[in-house]
Amino acid sequence: MATTTAGRVRTVTGTAVLAALVLVIAFGNPAYTDWAKNHTANDAWGFFLKQLAWPTWSFSSDESVRTILANDIKAVLLIVLTGVFVSLMVDSAASRSGRLFFSSWGAYLFAGALAGLLAAFIQANASLRAAFDWAAGGAIYGLFVGWVLAVVVFASRR
């Protein structure tokens, strides 16, 4: 599904990938993740702000190299898998409908869960239980943050 505006073609998948990239860069960076960890309250809004930092990425840290690599790959996989799942789940006839909103939200939820599951096996002391925890964290991230992506995708359609 593509919309042509002034010589440009916007697709749902492209919009979703761009929104996911912005979310990961803006809220997964070390400055935001440290701020969210240290300065948010233990309430619903603080929970949401901490969830925004789930796809954390870093180039240097006190953690092991494998954990840093796993976190970075998790962030990249989230963006790539968002494109894959949106292209698979969004119907071409779902322009400006509830189906577009909920299918793009669900695609982000699945992308987060699968990115967490796959990246968990790279970290130091990887285990199946830890992979399930990372997948659950990705699903929670997709549930609470995916609506932001869904709103952007929905608003991009005319």
Task: Give the predicted meaning of each segment.
Residues 2-25, 95-106:
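Alpha-helical transmembrane segments and their helix-start/interface "positive-inside/aromatic belt" motifs
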Residues 107-158:
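Alpha-helical transmembrane segments of multi-pass integral membrane proteins
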